[in-house]
Design a protein with these regions (language model features):
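Terminal-appendage/accessory-domain detector
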Residues: 1-207
Length: 207
């Protein structure tokens, strides 16, 4: 890869290729995780050394590094956000058991962050995907729609839905703005409380 990357998912950069391959499968196929017989992942040797030995991850940090858990979360949830790295999710006994079954190996023919993913169901269906350039890399850039979707996901706890759309609109019109200060002021707006109203200053300080 060359140039800066804008990764779509909150996990280690070196397994973004694996994540891209996983999403390539789950977004095209309706796979019931309970019907999966085997989930096999092949990584380059350096990436395997970093991420291929966390089938029994201990906590959030190891979950973020674990090819086993990340693939498991994508298969089960069909998404990967910070929610998948909360204890309530990565400590789910069902996900932990499945992660231990995921087969991760080093493949000598793979280089860098390239990855191969193979899924076989109990019924005999097989699905495969290969990724050489992960989504978000300069060679496989996120689309505007994907960037906007990521912003909507992570801004939801801070800004109202209308405010989020206003920010996106301001970015689209940025080159026509008299000053970037307008956008900066919008991004510094009062965060949302759990009930959807602006959170008090004291509450934000405690958070």
């Amino acid at each position: 890869m060359s140039g800066p990357a804008a990764w779509p998912w909150p996990a280690a950069s070196s397994i973004q290729g694996m994540m891209t391959a996983m999403f390539d499968i789950v977004e095209k196929q309706k796979i019931d995780p309970a019907q999966v017989k085997t989930l096999r992942i092949a990584l380059s040797q350096p990436v395997f050394d970093l991420h291929g030995n966390f089938s029994r991850y201990k906590a959030k940090f190891e979950a973020l590094l674990s090819a086993h858990y990340v693939a498991t979360a994508i298969l089960h949830d069909r998404e990967l956000t910070l929610a998948q790295f909360e204890p309530a999710r990565y400590d789910d006994p069902k996900l932990r058991r499945f992660a231990e079954r995921v087969e991760v190996r080093a493949e000598p023919s793979l280089r860098g962050v390239a990855a191969l993913v193979d899924v076989e169901t109990i019924g005999g269906d097989e699905f495969s995907a290969r990724c050489d350039q992960p989504l978000g890399a300069p060679e496989n850039k996120l689309s505007r729609a994907q960037i906007e979707a990521k912003f909507r996901t992570y801004a939801a706890g801070r800004l109202s839905q209308q405010h989020i759309e206003d920010v996106i609109g301001a970015v689209v019109r940025l080159e026509h703005q008299a000053s970037v200060r307008t956008l900066m002021d919008m991004l510094r707006a009062t965060p949302q409380s759990a009930a959807g109203a602006p959170a008090p200053i004291a509450a934000r300080a405690r958070g």
